[in-house]
Amino acid sequence: MLRGTFVALITPFAGEEIDEPRLRDLVDWLIANRVDGLVPCGTTGETPSLSDTEWQRVAAVVIEQAAGRVPVIVGTGTNSTMVTIQRTRVARELGATAAMVVTPYYNKPQQDGLYRHVAAIADAVDLPLVIYNVPSRTGVNLAPETARRLLDIAPVIAFKDSSGSLDQVSELVLAVGDRSSVLSGDDSLTLPIIAVGGQGVVSVLANIAPAATATMVRAALDGDLARARQLHGELFPLARALFIETNPVPVKTAAELLGLCSATVRLPLAPLAPANRERLLAALASCPHTASLLARPMGEAA
């Protein structure tokens, strides 16, 4: 089971190439700021825009740079069961702690199809799994009852829920009990999800405000509601601003403004609109946990 703050890592680019030096710097900076784990090759990492070779390289670099200091959960999910099995095997060979498997997108499988998909992966590869439910992107919702059934046949150590529904998260927490963790996939809902029984977050926000995000989550899990609410209030406007356009466009723009890496995203994603860039800059300047990093030279924040 997982507990704490796990960073949904961005993938820095230098032109058309992966910016490995910035990626390594980012890993070190996040670990120094006491996050509990790293999740490369997910939605925020622009995985659908990476070649197979690039996907493997990003996973390998993060695992190598983390060097066992924190768990590394590699995104291996695709909309092909066969390809997902292949990638999960590679993640295991690279030394990943676990694989994050998103529900298959575009295909719109039934609940039985989702069950069989995860069962096939678990049968083929001996690696703990984090199941990722994000209906807004996949077109399918993993039902809490299906999640409960998966625990009987697969080593699922956590469910990442980005349904946006506290009712569903509450049902999921009740369905899985103490057999697995439930992690928020929405930064703005992290505190409420912990309040109903969640155990942490897979966080976009933690790419740029790692220490504050991790401190908020620890406070909430430790029962320090006053501290958790204070940090939630300080971080909430920025968390919302990171979704003024499609993720990860805003968070990569924020990373550039904070001197962490280039804002470059790959097509079909486009750069942040100028008006939204100004809104994002205002949110960064207003947040006490990012304001001091603004205008640093590239790489200095790391």
From Swiss-Prot:
It holds the Pfam family DHDPS. Its EC number is 4.3.3.7. It comes from the Bacteria. SUPFAM superfamilies: Aldolase (SSF51569). It catalyses: L-aspartate 4-semialdehyde + pyruvate = (2S,4S)-4-hydroxy-2,3,4,5-tetrahydrodipicolinate + H2O + H(+). One of its GO terms (cellular component) is cytosol. Signal peptide: none annotated. Pyruvate binds at residues 44, 202. The record marks 43, 106 as: Part of a proton relay during catalysis. The active site is at residues 132, 160. InterPro entries: Aldolase_TIM, DapA, DapA-like, Schiff_base-form_aldolases_AS. The keyword Ligase does not apply. Its main location: cytoplasm. Keywords: Amino-acid biosynthesis, Cytoplasm, Diaminopimelate biosynthesis, Lyase, Lysine biosynthesis, Schiff base. Catalyzes the condensation of (S)-aspartate-beta-semialdehyde [(S)-ASA] and pyruvate to 4-hydroxy-tetrahydrodipicolinate (HTPA). Belongs to the DapA family. NCBIfam families: dapA. This is 4-hydroxy-tetrahydrodipicolinate synthase. It comes from Thermomicrobium roseum (strain ATCC 27502 / DSM 5159 / P-2). The lineage of its organism: Bacteria, Pseudomonadati, Thermomicrobiota, Thermomicrobia, Thermomicrobiales. The gene is dapA.
